């Protein structure tokens, strides 16, 4: 191998004094130009080790070719990780907010097996115990799941809940000084496909957090710590509404049964 293009060996010269503490006695090294590639550096290191071997220095426990390979591979892995950490999603993705990804039909019952029933005149949902032939009163919902470019929570999934066969969607907004549950008509459902985090359309979103198999809580995305709930008693006059987690006499866990 010809190493003259990478270095020249000079014995006992004052210019190589800086290398005297790093090379075996009697050997000095002067780099003729700056290496510009990893290959040049590798050739230079291997050449130094072989020269040291030629002067009677054993390479047995010192730097070996496989050590150089490990060093180069580790360097490549470290460089890759740095690039990944420095990368960031484009501003357009960060501003996209919530994006709908899927939808399926479902029905909801509370922990006392009361079903949601639509009261058309009052435009409210009520929780009732249905038996036998009255089960057809049970409301069927279209549940839409959403994702965000940067996940807000790892244990919760944003969802929207619409009454099947209608333009009515559950929403949470303030009324009488407190968050309350409403049924709102959405004429253009395309508005719900992508929702900005700063938009008032966030009122249609709820964080579904699973607490068991098909058992979930539904927290308002607009008013954190406020959950969809039903009355603990079988009082059919009280609507499905919002409450805080620790509210007495309210049920906040629901079985969400998928139908397709």
Curated annotation (Swiss-Prot):
Known function: Potent pro-inflammatory cytokine. Initially discovered as the major endogenous pyrogen, induces prostaglandin synthesis, neutrophil influx and activation, T-cell activation and cytokine production, B-cell activation and antibody production, and fibroblast proliferation and collagen production. Involved in transduction of inflammation downstream of pyroptosis: its mature form is specifically released in the extracellular milieu by passing through the gasdermin-D (GSDMD) pore.
Signal peptide bounds: none
InterPro entries: IL-1_fam, IL1/FGF
GO terms of molecular function: cytokine activity; integrin binding
Primary location recorded for the protein, binned into one broad class: cytoplasm
GO biological process: cellular response to lipopolysaccharide; cortisol secretion; cytokine-mediated signaling pathway; fever generation; immune response; macrophage chemotaxis; neutrophil activation; positive regulation of cell division
Source species taxonomy: Eukaryota, Metazoa, Chordata, Craniata, Vertebrata
Localization of this protein: Cytoplasm, Cytosol; Secreted; Lysosome; Secreted, Extracellular exosome
Keywords carried by this UniProt record: Cytokine, Cytoplasm, Inflammatory response, Lysosome, Mitogen, Pyrogen, Secreted
Tissue: All three isoforms are expressed in gill, kidney, liver and spleen. Isoform 1 is also expressed in blood. None of the isoforms are expressed in brain.
Assembly notes: Monomer.
One Pfam family from the record: IL1
Organism: Oncorhynchus mykiss
Family membership noted in the UniProt record: Belongs to the IL-1 family.
GO cellular component, one term: extracellular space
Protein name per its UniProtKB record: Interleukin-1 beta
Other remarks on this protein: IL1B production occurs in 2 steps, each being controlled by different stimuli. First, inflammatory signals, such as LPS, stimulate the synthesis and promote the accumulation of cytosolic stores of pro-IL1B (priming). Then additional signals are required for inflammasome assembly, leading to CASP1 activation, pro-IL1B processing and eventually secretion of the active cytokine. IL1B processing and secretion are temporarily associated.
Gene: il1b
């Amino acid at each position: 191998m010809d190493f003259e293009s990478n270095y020249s060996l000079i014995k006992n010269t004052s210019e190589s004094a800086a290398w005297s503490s790093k090379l075996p006695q009697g050997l000095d090294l002067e780099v003729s130009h700056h290496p510009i590639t990893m290959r040049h550096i590798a050739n230079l290191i291997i050449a130094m080790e072989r020269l040291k071997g030629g002067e009677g220095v054993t390479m047995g426990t010192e730097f070996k070719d496989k050590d150089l390979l490990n060093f180069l591979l580790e360097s490549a892995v470290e460089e890759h990780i740095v690039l990944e950490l420095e990368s960031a999603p484009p501003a357009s993705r960060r501003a996209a907010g919530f994006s709908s990804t899927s939808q399926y039909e479902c029905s909801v019952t509370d922990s006392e097996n009361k079903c949601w029933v639509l009261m058309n005149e009052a435009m409210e949902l009520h929780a009732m115990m249905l038996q036998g032939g009255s089960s057809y009163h049970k409301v069927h919902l279209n549940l839409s799941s959403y994702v965000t470019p940067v996940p807000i929570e790892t244990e919760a999934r944003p969802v929207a809940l619409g009454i099947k066969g209608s333009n009515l969607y559950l929403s949470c907004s303030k009324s009488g000084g407190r968050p309350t549950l409403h049924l709102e008509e959405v004429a253009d459902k395309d508005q719900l496909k992508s929702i900005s985090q700063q938009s008032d359309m966030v009122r249609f979103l709820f964080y579904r957090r699973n607490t068991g198999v098909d058992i979930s809580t539904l927290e308002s995305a607009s008013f954190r710590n406020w959950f969809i709930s039903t009355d603990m008693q079988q009082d059919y006059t009280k609507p499905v509404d919002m409450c805080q987690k620790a509210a007495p006499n309210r049920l906040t866990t629901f079985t969400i049964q998928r139908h397709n």
